[in-house]
Amino acid sequence: MLLGAARILKENEDKIEGTVKLIFQPAEEGGAGGKMMREQGVLEKPKVRQIFALHVAGTMPMGTLASKEGTLLAATSSIKILVKGNGGHAAAPHHTIDPVVTGSKIVVELQTLISRELSPLESGVISITMANAGSATNVIPSTMELQGTIRSLTSEGISKLQNRVKEVAESIAIANRCEAEVSFPGNDYPPTVNDAGCWELGKAAAKDILGQEKVSEMDSIMGGEDFAYYTEEIPGCFSFLGVGNPEIDAVYDVHHPMFKVDEEALSLGTAVHVNTAIKALENLTI
């Protein structure tokens, strides 16, 4: 979609007053490419004043668009917990210090941070998605490794949950004669916050292309995006473009192994990109 927009904008550059930068997303999935790009000056020379992005959504009907002003996407952080015990024969657990039992207790107890410590009026997620320990049925291993993710709609919420994850994991490990090493590898993504004016502009640009009834407001979701590194610096808007179509079995969302795109949406996305850029430039030169 962005390559298509590049071609159209280039073919019409003599009619455009201003500069449009087209930014792709290296290392978006966990690598915080947006942070690296920002640090290397992608928003400078010339200075970028507004920024817009589209993300496909397989569960939204083809040709629809949705977003909102304010916080759209969550701040995110990775979790890694290494539980250390003392392995031995599974038939003699009393001669071991079992990290699997301890790790299991940690997984369960972390959920109470959301249900019992987070305000019901706030949003937060702790999901342990990987648990690795041992390689034999008759051996209690010496270590268990847990990995997962934390989500919150604020950076402050992420920091608070990180502190409590560390405290809870280490305390449970001590109570069970184990040791827990807790880390948060990689980069913490900030929340993606849409500027109100940019959403209004993006909404109008999308309605020109898709139609009034195809553009709507949506609720915040707990996914994360490295686009957030840009909106920390300048006003911007991140929107979702529907690519779903049950007639071709395009009904699964991103990250699903059966994810499929109705490619008719791609040309619409290109047109939305172009119209948004033109409207933004017109608005900035008024």
What is the predicted role of each segment?
Residues V101-I286:
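Metal-dependent amide/peptide-bond hydrolase catalytic core
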